[in-house]
């Protein structure tokens, strides 16, 4: 389903008091992220992680992995939020619609995720806390037989997860 944790690496739910502390931090960051043009923000993993979806149409031209100028303003604000919240790990996933072959879509989805990754690095976000991956057309969220559905399926999803330090700090605070 739509709210399923896409990244297998999304991690176990911490739960309890420590999970509530992490959830509060994620609530604050989610509120910040909701101000960004073109970003759809939802909390996942019982509120302990954030999923931000950027429609590829906002970021890229068709069949392109070059960020357009309009998307840069959104990603600048996104990078700023990541820098203000350093105790998180960031997973960037590229997705395409089903138009074209896997031979085109799979590398395109990787290049799109990598473009976002490289742009965030250029804005000062540490590459050590980020990873990226492309899924081609294997994880549609809408019907590929309609133009609107294909538009929804062309997207970059970014998961913001508590890193080991945030989890450790929350567990100590919860004691």
Question: Locations of the language-model features?
Answer:
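Amphipathic, membrane-active segments
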Residues: 26-54, 58
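Acidic/histidine-rich, surface-exposed loop or edge segments in extracytoplasmic proteins
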Residues: 12-16, 53-61
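Periplasmic peptidoglycan-binding/anchoring modules of Gram-negative envelope and division proteins
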Residues: 38, 59-94, 121, 151, ...
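Conserved beta-strand core positions
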Residues: 50, 88-90, 130, 156
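Second-shell loop/turn segments in exported
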Residues: 18-20, 59-68, 102-105
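Short, low-complexity, glycine-enriched hydrophobic/amphipathic alpha-helices that associate
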Residues: 1-31
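Extracytoplasmic/secreted proteins, especially bacterial periplasmic and envelope-associated proteins
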Residues: 12-13, 28, 32, 70-77, ...
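Periplasmic OmpA-like peptidoglycan-binding domain that tethers envelope proteins to the cell wall
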Residues: 95-169
């Amino acid at each position: 389903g739509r709210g399923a944790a896409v990244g297998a690496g999304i991690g176990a739910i911490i739960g309890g008091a420590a999970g509530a502390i992490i959830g509060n931090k994620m609530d604050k960051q989610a509120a910040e992220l909701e101000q960004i043009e073109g970003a759809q923000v939802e909390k996942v993993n019982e509120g302990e992680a954030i999923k931000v979806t950027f429609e590829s149409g906002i970021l890229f031209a068709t069949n392109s992995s070059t960020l357009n100028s309009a998307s840069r303003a959104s990603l600048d604000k996104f990078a700023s939020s990541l820098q203000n919240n350093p105790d998180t790990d960031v997973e960037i996933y590229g997705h395409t619609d089903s138009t074209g072959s896997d031979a085109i879509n799979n590398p395109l989805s990787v290049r799109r995720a990598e473009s976002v990754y490289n742009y965030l690095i250029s804005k000062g976000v540490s590459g050590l806390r980020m990873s990226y991956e492309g899924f081609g057309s294997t994880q549609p969220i809408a019907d590929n037989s309609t133009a609107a559905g294909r538009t929804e399926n062309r997207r970059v999803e970014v998961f913001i997860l508590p890193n080991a330090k945030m989890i450790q700090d929350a567990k100590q605070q919860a004691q």
